[in-house]
């Protein structure tokens, strides 16, 4: 509950009450809880602390060195939720207090590169946000430029579709020439409600069944509404792939030819790969970099529907 309050109302908590500042008591307590045996408590503590970074809370900044030391200590935590909040905190610090990270940037960069490749996509996404934030600040360009040879290829690899993406894209295959199966065209459910017919009085409501023969209750109607919106949500949801593409886009604007020199060989390998997923990620990368570098994509025949759409 306190975690949510810190996240939603950090400014309301960073106030003076009867001559005292509650955060001056809470911040040291959160720092102590970051070492709690429970990973859930550690994650909540770091999350609470990070909520006060964007507002420039002096109660937190009075302990900023201790906070950063706490993040470094928890960087290798076994719990992915804790690591995710560590990455998130480092992103917020980079945006608000880059001066505090620059002395340790070599170590921070190595950690964030490692985390960008984390198996847990939530951790990887937060780490990828670090590079997007880094690239968006023109004042940090001199510090980011030497990291391009390491950062850019990692971002390129992050643009390959994940297993979850592929599950969603299963319906995107080019199957116009394939006859529909019965399950493709069968209505989801039958019955009065499906056709806007209501039953009143003592009339027995018509039995409704789903596409697989199961009997449906009233609560299932909302489930179907949710299912209808699921594809749209998936297509617009911010994820690792989109974050990496956005970071490459900004890097292209910022560094232009220098970025292309770094990515020329990896891009060539992607575009000539026998794996269509790798080829697609290469095309996406070129598209992301095109505006910053003045590139133009030329459409060419390709056997996979998604590849044709990307190159068009």
Where are these regions (language model features)?
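Hydrophobic, aliphatic-enriched repeat segments that assemble into extended interaction scaffolds
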Residues: 3, 113-117, 121-180
